[in-house]
Amino acid sequence: MAVTPLIPVMLFDMDGVLVDVSGSYRRAIEETVYHFTGREVQQEMIQRYKDRGGFNDDWELTHTIIGDFGMETPFARVVTEFQRRYRGEDWDGFITEEHPFIQTETLLELKKLGHILGIVTGRPEVEAYWTLDRWGWREFFPLLIGRERQGNRKKPDPFPLLLALGRLNAAGIQVPAERTVYIGDSVDDVTAAHAAGMLSIGVVHPSADPQTHEPLLLERGANLVITDPNSLPEIVSWPNDWAGNMFEA
């Protein structure tokens, strides 16, 4: 008989957790800002905005940076130029430069351990599924909550995470928030998880400085911060090591 994991549901942010987007989303931000302002922005500057919170949406972040450089540009124009670079004319943009940040074998192991895996992301769902299909990952994620389903209640609002739990409950999978973990790389991810009553694991992605990003995520309420998502199978198997003693029999 299958044994139910102590943490049955694992919800993932996509960018910076499952996917290395330093050469795609981050590059699209840089080039779109340059297109409108002629000013160069570095990865460190983008990360500083992210660390302030409230910039989980890269379209909105790009629009804000352009405005901070003194250029008033309609949001729709920013999105058009961003997507022209990121998605491309025929799925031939920077999205093709993305690489997995987690190994397929890790996802397979989590599935074998009995975890239900889901994604809660700010990506449009068509882009999220394109990436999952590209790497053969769709089978691992029966649940995906993308940008379109979040309205004006994106992270750090807990709504997308609670929506994911609601979808599972509607499918007959009754799991309380406190037995669910959200794995994300930003302060908005940690804030959303905390507000939803979920456990939170922060990830320091390759373009972030672990000496500054790890303590920031812990300060915002992450239960644990890791640099390698491939360590997750062992970590979630022993939650008392990082989530207190709430899992004692």
Task: Give the positions of each predicted feature.
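N-terminal helical cap/lid subdomain that shapes the substrate entry/recognition surface
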Residues: 5-14, 18-103, 108-109
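Substrate-recognition element of Asp-dependent hydrolases with the DxDx(T/V) motif
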Residues: 17, 29, 105-135, 141-147
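Conserved SAM-binding loop
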Residues: 18, 117, 182-183, 225
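A short, structured active-site edge motif that brings together acidic residues
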Residues: 46-50, 78, 138-153
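Conserved H-loop
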Residues: 138-142, 174, 223
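Conserved Lys-Pro-Asp/Glu-containing loop-to-beta segment of HAD-superfamily phosphomonoesterases
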Residues: 155-190
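Acidic, Mg2+-coordinating phosphoryl-transfer loop and its flanking beta/alpha structural elements
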Residues: 182-224
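Short acidic-hydrophobic, aromatic-tinged amphipathic segments that line or gate anion-handling sites
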Residues: 223-231
